């Protein structure tokens, strides 16, 4: 009896996702370009020639927004289904956090969000893909910002060591997560936001797990939410993935 190969469901999902992305993205791009052309043509026409010009322009612009959102959702799903190969380097977790916060300085200032950062006094060496880790932190910080509707919006970011592992904790003073929804927040496509894709937190957890880490959530309705990402130290990472890495690695962001 011939041996049967065990199928990898993640690989299958990745193959399906790639096929769907190709089939959907091309007509989606055409729709976006046509909506752009329609908007430009309408804008150039005299108002007297098109009595409903304002309404038609609004429809064209709405189409642009919808197609752009669909394209972003498609990109997010493809990233989840077929995670990119990690480019591991030696980083300081403090520096990754600092650079991510600097990237959001203007956004938070515009939204009236106060950020308080308390970083561990010494470097926290981790083996990581710096870009992916920053993406995960960026998603968590933007989630925290969107969860706050109070007059005084505050995000506290802390790094440290607990249970022998470096961590980063992002705490907001927002609405908190209802008890009934807490089991679902990492479920693909689950969202309670009007324009949410339901991809942000699943991608965060996927990235954290790719790094041998974990993510924990503590939340209280009306008070806020704390998301804690714990990662292995450099030597812990090597022990978890023996033979996967060379002894010498590039330094991607150590102080």
Description of each model-found segment:
Residues 89-101:
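A conserved beta-strand-to-alpha-helix junction within the catalytic ATP-binding
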